[in-house]
Amino acid sequence: MKHHLIHKASRRSVLRLAVAGLGAVSLGTSSVAYAAAETITVWKTPTCGCCKVWVAHLRKNGFDVVTNDVSDTTAIRKKLGFPEQFGSCHTAKLGEYVIEGHVPAEDIRKLLQDKPQARGLAVPNMPLGSPGMEGIGTNAGVRQAYNVLLVLNDGSSRVFKSYAAIPPVKT
């Protein structure tokens, strides 16, 4: 009977490897395998609902996520050397990169694949429709236009990817 029992953590590891393997077959190995093998460490406040939804978005997209509840993320950004003007409600670290705000998982994968000389990615201002900020009720499916910024080592930024607005559906 014991040999039929698989620990929950072992099941998760097997599932991650299977997902990474399927992704590697269809997308190439570099970005999917790297993302599945890396752990994203997230600092957020314990009561922030959108942070929890963003973490779920990352997990759904194959990332291993460790969360740390803090009263304020400002000190973490400062410790990581990430410019405060890009600050949002949560801060994450993945390898050498900082991820700030509601950055989509696909953009994190592209960052890992391209490996630019940069501090990381940021989505300031918590735009409606970004991962973790999906609207509900009358705002379901609505997205404000927003940019994912590549924050360079000198503290400047450039647009990494732009997302167009999706207006509300008129009934």
Predicted segments with their positions:
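N-terminal secretory signal peptides
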Residues: 1-13, 17-27
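Boundary at the C-terminal end of the N-terminal hydrophobic targeting segment
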Residues: 33-37
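Stable alpha-helical elements in mature extracytoplasmic
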Residues: 47, 54, 69-72, 104-108
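Conserved helix-turn-beta segment immediately C-terminal to the redox Cys motif
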Residues: 56-67
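Local sequence-structure signature of Cys/Sec-based thiol-disulfide redox active-site neighborhoods
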Residues: 38-53
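Thiol/selenol-based redox catalytic cores and closely related redox-interacting motifs
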Residues: 85-169
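Thiol-based oxidoreductase modules, predominantly thioredoxin-like and allied folds used
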Residues: 65-76, 86, 94
